[in-house]
From Swiss-Prot:
Keyword NAD: no
Residues reported to bind S-adenosyl-L-methionine: 120, 140-145
Family per similarity comment: Belongs to the RNA methyltransferase TrmD family.
Assigned keywords, A-Z: Cytoplasm, Methyltransferase, S-adenosyl-L-methionine, Transferase, tRNA processing
UniProt-listed Enzyme Commission number(s): 2.1.1.228
HAMAP family: TrmD (MF_00605)
Highest taxon, organism lineage: Bacteria
One GO molecular-function entry: tRNA (guanine(37)-N1)-methyltransferase activity
Protein name stated in the entry: tRNA (guanine-N(1)-)-methyltransferase
Record function comment: Specifically methylates guanosine-37 in various tRNAs.
Gene3D superfamilies, alphabetized: 3.40.1280.10, tRNA(m1g37)methyltransferase, domain 2
């Protein structure tokens, strides 16, 4: 796909290019590509292999199970990706050994004009390729995937959301979970009542100030309940502190009321 001179270019080195290319066909990433905000291309190292079998892996030195991805095909694929655009590219290896991908790192990715994602397979990639070509390693969590493609797709989607013009509503990214360092507040839509569960009255009041206060209170409270680590060391202003204290008091009162009901 062809982008504009100001578009972000994303290249992915993968033995499964069709898998990664799907991310540019749907949702936010698809719309951003259609608008020329991003350009995504996949590069298969098999196309740069040295033999007629397009071999990209070999047995590990020192023995052991599995296969290791070879230096030469990956190196040539990365060089081809670099040559496709004159702008400097940051090469990122998706690996469980990398730094954890969080919203701050996502924002830095979104600010990069060019990123090349390197997706490993098998037992891993020859260390010499990583030493020569990789600028950064990123992980999406402490678990093992079959390859880096899914992690690359996660990073691409998260970063594209922050590219100006990618979302239908410019405030959407600013209000996402983690964008403010807090989890998101609850959301509701029609109908007003579903199986006896209603929408909070404040959201139907038309009072935008009250709605904003309720949403901030819920975001603070939900973060306290589900991800207290995000609040550790965070400096809350007076309003935030008051709203969080109110939420905690209300939550504990509801819990006590529930316990009293269970005992009767």
């Amino acid at each position: 796909m062809t982008g504009t001179p100001n578009s972000r270019r994303i290249d992915v080195i993968t033995v499964f290019p069709e898998m990664v290319e799907q991310v540019a066909r749907f949702g936010v990433v698809g719309r951003a590509a259609e608008r020329g905000l991003i350009e995504l291309s996949a590069w298969n190292p098999r196309d740069y292999a040295e033999d007629r079998h397009a071999t990209v892996d070999d047995r590990p030195y020192g023995g052991g199970p599995g296969m290791v991805m070879k230096v030469a095909p990956l190196h040539r694929a990365i060089q081809a990706a670099r040559a496709a655009d004159p702008r400097p590219a940051r090469v990122i290896h998706l690996s469980p050994q990398g730094a954890r991908l969080d919203q701050d790192r996502v924002a830095r990715l979104a600010a990069c004009e060019r990123v090349i994602y390197l997706c490993g397979r098998y037992e891993g990639i020859d260390e010499r390729l990583l030493e020569a070509e990789v600028d950064e390693e990123l992980s999406i969590g402490d678990y093992v995937l079959s390859g880096g493609e899914l992690a690359a797709m996660v990073a691409i989607d998260a970063a594209t959301r922050l590219v100006p013009g990618a979302l239908g509503h410019e405030d959407s990214a600013a209000e996402d979970s983690f964008a403010t360092g807090l989890l998101d507040h609850p959301h509701y839509t029609r109908p007003e009542v579903y199986e006896r569960r209603g929408v909070p009255e404040v959201l139907r009041s038309g009072d935008h100030g009250a709605v904003d206060t309720w949403r901030l209170k819920q975001a603070l409270g939900r973060t306290w309940l589900r991800r207290p680590d995000l609040l550790a060391g965070r400096e809350l202003d007076e309003r935030q502190r008051r709203l969080l204290d109110e939420f905690i008091a209300e939550h504990r009162a509801e819990a006590r009321a529930g316990n009293d009901h269970d005992e009767t």
